[in-house]
Amino acid sequence: MKSCAVSLTTAAVAFGDEAKKMAEGKASRESEEESVSLTVEEREALGGMDSRLFGFVRLHEDGARTKTLLGKAVRCYESLILKAEGKVESDFFCQLGHFNLLLEDYSKALSAYQRYYSLQADYWKNAAFLYGLGLVYFYYNAFHWAIKAFQDVLYVDPSFCRAKEIHLRLGLMFKVNTDYKSSLKHFQLALIDCNPCTLSNAEIQFHIAHLYETQRKYHSAKEAYEQLLQTENLPAQVKATVLQQLGWMHHNMDLVGDKATKESYAIQYLQKSLEADPNSGQSWYFLGRCYSSIGKVQDAFISYRQSIDKSEASADTWCSIGVLYQQQNQPMDALQAYICAVQLDHGHAAAWMDLGTLYESCNQPQDAIKCYLNAARSKRCSNTSTLAARIKFLQNGSDNWNGGQSLSHHPVQQVYSLCLTPQKLQHLEQLRANRDNLNPAQKHQLEQLESQFVLMQQMRHKEVAQVRTTGIHNGAITDSSLPTNSVSNRQPHGALTRVSSVSQPGVRPACVEKLLSSGAFSAGCIPCGTSKILGSTDTILLGSNCIAGSESNGNVPYLQQNTHTLPHNHTDLNSSTEEPWRKQLSNSAQGLHKSQSSCLSGPNEEQPLFSTGSAQYHQATSTGIKKANEHLTLPSNSVPQGDADSHLSCHTATSGGQQGIMFTKESKPSKNRSLVPETSRHTGDTSNGCADVKGLSNHVHQLIADAVSSPNHGDSPNLLIADNPQLSALLIGKANGNVGTGTCDKVNNIHPAVHTKTDHSVASSPSSAISTATPSPKSTEQRSINSVTSLNSPHSGLHTVNGEGLGKSQSSTKVDLPLASHRSTSQILPSMSVSICPSSTEVLKACRNPGKNGLSNSCILLDKCPPPRPPTSPYPPLPKDKLNPPTPSIYLENKRDAFFPPLHQFCTNPKNPVTVIRGLAGALKLDLGLFSTKTLVEANNEHMVEVRTQLLQPADENWDPTGTKKIWRCESNRSHTTIAKYAQYQASSFQESLREENEKRTQHKDHSDNESTSSENSGRRRKGPFKTIKFGTNIDLSDNKKWKLQLHELTKLPAFARVVSAGNLLTHVGHTILGMNTVQLYMKVPGSRTPGHQENNNFCSVNINIGPGDCEWFVVPEDYWGVLNDFCEKNNLNFLMSSWWPNLEDLYEANVPVYRFIQRPGDLVWINAGTVHWVQAVGWCNNIAWNVGPLTACQYKLAVERYEWNKLKSVKSPVPMVHLSWNMARNIKVSDPKLFEMIKYCLLKILKQYQTLREALVAAGKEVIWHGRTNDEPAHYCSICEVEVFNLLFVTNESNTQKTYIVHCHDCARKTSKSLENFVVLEQYKMEDLIQVYDQFTLALSLSSSS
């Protein structure tokens, strides 16, 4: 890889030269300059330092010398840059970014990386830069951009030495984004890598087990946890966390066994967990939940008390305590506990509903209504309709209620309002520190805050004195079985963290003091305001669960005197969690606020910077596990999605338990260590496994960010270099004054992944180089010099640097880049000008120097190509009246029309994204009955059918399961059955529909009534619940013996649409690709959906409707797939792998044209290359489909682009493009110059790579064994990363002996075994054979030119 290290010798010389030019009289200035000069030894030590050492370099204790050296280097670089007015080599900024990153000065690192990105056109070649940039994004929780940066690293350098760290972070971030399949894949890739990592394999295995848990795969999770417990020398903290998770799963999840048995196991596991880590507040809390569920009230209270003593107060814990008090007929204590809960988390829906229930039972409907309204405002209360009905009921009947007197000895509003929020306390400290410089308004504000603070202290002492002896009554338990769901049953989230052994004094609500001073709880130091994170740095964070916004004043009404008990209201009410906070991380939801003592947003914001999941004001007091002299934060949160009954019905709390799984590696052990953060874990029956990824750094640090914060924070601290304004301005660039202001919309813009499409096809795609041999980086990388400071306008054009054009700013003196002995040798050197004209002899001669000629990856196009990017929306945008274009359709009257050559040309024309050929079956006399359900059952009734369970919805709409809002995610769960069983379902569905129609006819007498009822039914469909349907899909008809008649019938089609033909690229693959060069069948009932997608590798497709019903199609041209990809990312969906159904309103607003048409029986739909489409059945019907690859430059280009995009996204390409390209060269005479150039260059590239790798293996003493290849042998893919492996197969010794041949690519083999001692290298093609194919593949003369 290309190094970004600046020659420190050159830097020192340049610095010295500048010093000589200074006036002799400025001795003090010269002395200052000499103080930051670097010695030869220092330059050598710094020569090998870049982002790859992040997390591995020690800066404290014995590493203090390194920290000092890095600080000195930063000052030297800053001084040099300042003197040169920013006109220095771009690599200076990159190295400055690395040094600041290693010093964990993320804002400075970000500024320097920004500058390097704006100056370096081919920044993407620098893997160390991309990695460092990804780490900064990761630190700031800008996961959308961190993912892109890390994927770029793996794309340009798959053998990157920190690939394991990247896969680990990608796994965590995809878990946050609920892309569980991708998350699991990256965790597994991290697990097989033998390179050093900041987490142990046991810790990674824990993440995998927890990932299963978050997907509700409880049995798989249980097996994974139990298997992890069998690991030898398992760290105590990992063991404690695993036992904690197992205990909670037995209590809360649907595991085998009766309730008593599961509770018994749960208690045993939790007790064992506490033996391993007695200071885990979370385990104590879970134990309290278990005791509560079996009626052991005193034990439950003791456990809750321990939880509060061991960790900071959480809203969930206080809500659970309130429920127990309520059960014991202690309404006043219950009231105080609920008040504590809502003070700690004003959005705690369950606590508000519990409080409302309490007021209802005491005949205070108006107060109950206020609480219910607060609950309804919470994002975590999804079932607002039931709650609204309850509020309406109380409003209508409140006049009949009898009021009583308050049980409270003091106004609850007073308690609530006197608790200063952490923001106000911080603001008070700031005002006190600047007392002498305040204006009159600020002085008045200071007086008010000080007065309120004194009253709060007085109230606290008064309450402690009043209730010192208050406790739990020892009377009979009114309900021997306390509610098991006294807090929401959301799955908690295993977390690997540590709690500070010395809690810092903090501010807590007065009611907390009161209840802690009662007989049931000790009045120990239980801060809810601050926590000290263990580690070498004393970072003090204000806890996010002590938030009591000023808007809440007066929202907690008085509790009137009433002697009634507190009955359970058995009103079903769901209070599920809020939408996952990750949705706000994508495009400008994060503020980049960070101060030395607090991460709060500022005095004007009531919420902390970052909410980890459904517990929006989540307690963030976690650290982690002792490791070898390094600190690592590896959070992992649970963002529950399941519904949980509220306390209005059975006391279920809903504050989401988001826990950060954080390992802390340090040199000194701590007494109090917990792998689970002591946070609110009112968790529910599911866990969305959201990883609160706060930093994976070599120091413990946390960023509490606000998931719903405004994109622009005017009062946020500046992220620039505050101690050097001049340097700050230089690093920003004088033309860009808004860089680094602490807002996420600025941060998002820094990433080099701005979508751009130039005239050279897709500029950001490797295939942009297809038409030109060696394009200039400037032409293909125009986006790199777009304004890097405002992603709000990513296409703001070129900007100047220091008043000059970019070209001038880059004309500074170039310096040599020294390499330390341990520096990666995978340099990216300037690519040679490559032509497709040279013979194979010249090609091989040019690459006789293994490892020294370009990229190490297997990109089959130009070395100069950056990682691929989706295209932006075409410009100018279409007018609104052009967004519903007519669908290109052709009507066939006879067989001659079907074979008319212009039909083929019309279908394959790139200007036609889709073509509907009407009447094809009739014109060709196709016997569609061969594909009818009846015939299929008669032919092979036990044939396997993949079944997708879906919700019946209108074709142009897609609602969430509750029917409350339109979404992109399309529910489609997979299972399997047989043709016979699905045929039975298909028939019964039809019969049921007939019965429903008959019932409608008998019930309604006139047409108007029918219309009214139809309208009502339509409205109900949108409100849910929706009817469940089953769609039979992907039925394989490839077996010629089983489906001979059906496959023979399809030979009647014209050649361009046939499954097998000489002009079909997929025919030349040489082996079967199910569903692509074979036929697949689909069996449908009304509403069956094929979600949005592009065909595999962007190949064309043919689809024929067998009937008897119709299908409705929605089609978007290929040019707009980037827009749909962006929509998917905004909705936390994977464009390639997820199931999604576009919202037509969103597409209309984005000016995306949509073709919409009906496919009738006998119609053939031709989907052109790259076209995006989704389909819904209107009636009962069957369809058949397959893919076709026209022999055109457009098809090949789009196929290669998707091949590279799949590689970037770690998705397997079903079509092996390298293998296919060599077969095309053998079998096809190509007359199209563009297509010929693309294929020829692919061959050249692969030939170079093969020669280079083979020579490197021979030079290393690794034997290459001839293996050969059978005729129909499929192309090979790496069993680890799933990239295509051509010719040289790395096979494990064991599989080679057993003849199973488990193939690895070279990079994965090296990661598994650095010296390849466990692998055998098999060769499938002789070099002579490939040389012959390459030389003989020449441009054929077309018929027109020859004539």
From Swiss-Prot:
Record-linked InterPro entries: Corepressor-Demethylase (IPR051630), JmjC_dom (IPR003347), KDM6_GATAL_sf (IPR046941), KDM6A_B-like_C-hel (IPR048562), KDM6A_B-like_GATAL (IPR048560), TPR-like_helical_dom_sf (IPR011990), TPR_rpt (IPR019734)
PROSITE patterns found in the cross-reference section: JMJC (PS51184), TPR (PS50005), TPR_REGION (PS50293)
Extent of the TPR repeats: 90-123, 127-160, 167-196, 202-235, 247-280, 281-314, 315-348, 349-382
GO molecular function terms attached to this record: chromatin DNA binding; histone demethylase activity; histone H3K27me2/H3K27me3 demethylase activity; metal ion binding; RNA polymerase II cis-regulatory region sequence-specific DNA binding
Biased composition (Polar residues): 571-601, 609-621, 782-795
Location(s), subcellular: Nucleus
Keyword NADP: no
Ranges of compositional bias, category Basic and acidic residues: 993-1010
Reactions that this protein is recorded to catalyse: N(6),N(6),N(6)-trimethyl-L-lysyl(27)-[histone H3] + 2 2-oxoglutarate + 2 O2 = N(6)-methyl-L-lysyl(27)-[histone H3] + 2 formaldehyde + 2 succinate + 2 CO2
GO biological process, one term: regulation of gene expression
List of residues binding Fe cation: H1093, E1095, H1173
Annotated region (Disordered), positions in chain: 571-621, 633-689, 757-819, 990-1026
Residue ranges of every copy of the JmjC domain listed in the record: 1042-1205
Residues modified as Phosphothreonine: T887
Broad EC category: oxidoreductase
Low complexity bias: start-end ranges: 761-779
Annotated family: Belongs to the UTX family.
Function field: Male-specific histone demethylase that catalyzes trimethylated 'Lys-27' (H3K27me3) demethylation in histone H3. Has relatively low lysine demethylase activity.
Subunit: Interacts with TLE1 and TLE2.
Name used for this protein in its record: Histone demethylase UTY
Species assigned in the record: Homo sapiens
Lineage of the species this protein comes from: Eukaryota, Metazoa, Chordata, Craniata, Vertebrata
